[in-house]
Amino acid sequence: MSRKTYEKIANINGMFNMLEQQIIHSQDMAHFRSDFFYVNHEHRENYEALLIYYKNSIDNPIVDGACYILALPEIFNSVDVFKSELPFSWVYDENGITETMKSLSIPLQYLVAAALEVTDVNIFKPSGFTMGMNNWNIAQMRIFWQYTAIIRKEAL
């Protein structure tokens, strides 16, 4: 392997070690959230607001993780989030995938679809997870990895 490959592997291993520590120390929620990967400050502020609005996020890691994704500025600014009973209620309706969902960038559509797949809701074939893994850039991968750490915080 080239040196560049070793550096990439070391960076990925470091990221997974950080995510593991987040899971281990998830009982201190303020500390837990301060170490999250956020695309920018607005992402973090949106996430904190959604956690207050969706009170069941405290006891439901799936809702917590959905709030993290919904807080992404591109999504948060496209959706009337405070009119939804659940964080992803806006994704599809009786007619299928909504125009709001279709208006998101393709990588974010895959991210939302992959998060829905955790609850056995499949809106794409091939799956959002499959398409995301083949198309996400490193920042989008980090968002997905962070999402998995949130929903699995009770794993240890």
Regions found by a protein language model. Name each.
Residues M1-P107, D120-L156:
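Extended, charge-biased low-complexity segments
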